[in-house]
């Protein structure tokens, strides 16, 4: 089975005297992959995302980034806009009507044209994708022997939106059916069964830190290391393990206790 590139944005909003909140989306139960799961905004990387990243009219701060990272950063910004209505590009303020029209155009077109449409839309707004807004956090792909319907290698990026003007957000109604701002600890406590294994591990990693500054510093120290779990047999029971030393507080669990798709 082919491994496809994907990208996700972990949007963070500071709270005075409390842990930061994360924007989480609930996927439509009708989706083939992770239907009904709580996930970060994101989706598949398209070839046109790389073209956007390498176009100085449409992007800034991408010099020195490899192609996979560059394309994934654009895809993370694009998918966040599609699924939530939050446009995290640099440029003149855009009113609600132009943004709504842009989002509708993305929704109406075929999936294969979304990245090209997004490039045209930000060009029309006079906007650019700023690579430095995204902080590399992790890369994940399924275990070699995992029983999954699709295989993705997903880049995860942290984005601090505390100082962003956040207009009312709304799910696209196709991939995402609900949105909420919630802490990592609350997600793990209240929605554990709705979290696929990578999301669960990433939230546990985030929950270790009291604020966004500490989280970003830890992410910079550890880098965006690729994690591929191992599924092994222990006494007739399959267990999932990930490497130690990568800032994840839990590195193993029985497969039967996890949601994998």
Give the role of each language-model region.
Residues 1-261:
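N-terminal leader/linker segments that precede catalytic domains of diphosphate-processing enzymes
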């Amino acid at each position: 089975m082919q491994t496809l590139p994907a990208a996700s944005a972990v949007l963070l909003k500071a709270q005075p005297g409390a842990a930061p909140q994360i924007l989480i989306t609930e996927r439509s139960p009708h989706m083939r992959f992770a239907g009904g799961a709580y996930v970060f905004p994101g989706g598949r990387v398209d070839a046109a995302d790389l073209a956007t990243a390498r176009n100085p009219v449409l992007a800034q701060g991408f010099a020195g980034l490899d192609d996979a990272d560059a394309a994934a950063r654009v895809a993370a910004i694009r998918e966040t806009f599609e699924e939530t209505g939050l446009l995290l590009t640099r440029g003149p303020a855009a009113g609600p009507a132009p943004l709504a029209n842009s989002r509708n155009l993305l929704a109406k077109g075929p999936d294969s044209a979304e990245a090209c449409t997004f490039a045209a839309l930000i060009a029309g707004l006079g906007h650019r994708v700023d690579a430095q807004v995204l902080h590399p956090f992790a890369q994940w792909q399924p275990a070699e022997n995992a029983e999954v319907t699709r295989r993705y290698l997903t880049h995860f990026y942290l984005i601090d939106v505390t100082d962003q003007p956040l207009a009312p957000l709304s799910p696209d109604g196709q991939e995402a059916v609900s949105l909420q701002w919630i802490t990592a600890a609350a997600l793990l406590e209240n929605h554990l069964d709705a979290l696929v294994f990578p999301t669960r591990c990433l939230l546990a990693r985030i929950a270790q830190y009291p604020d966004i500054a500490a989280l970003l510093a830890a992410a910079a120290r550890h880098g965006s290391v690729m994690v591929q779990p191992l599924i092994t047999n222990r006494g007739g029971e399959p267990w999932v393990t990930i490497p130690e030393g990568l800032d994840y507080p839990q590195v193993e669990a029985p497969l039967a206790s996890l949601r994998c798709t």
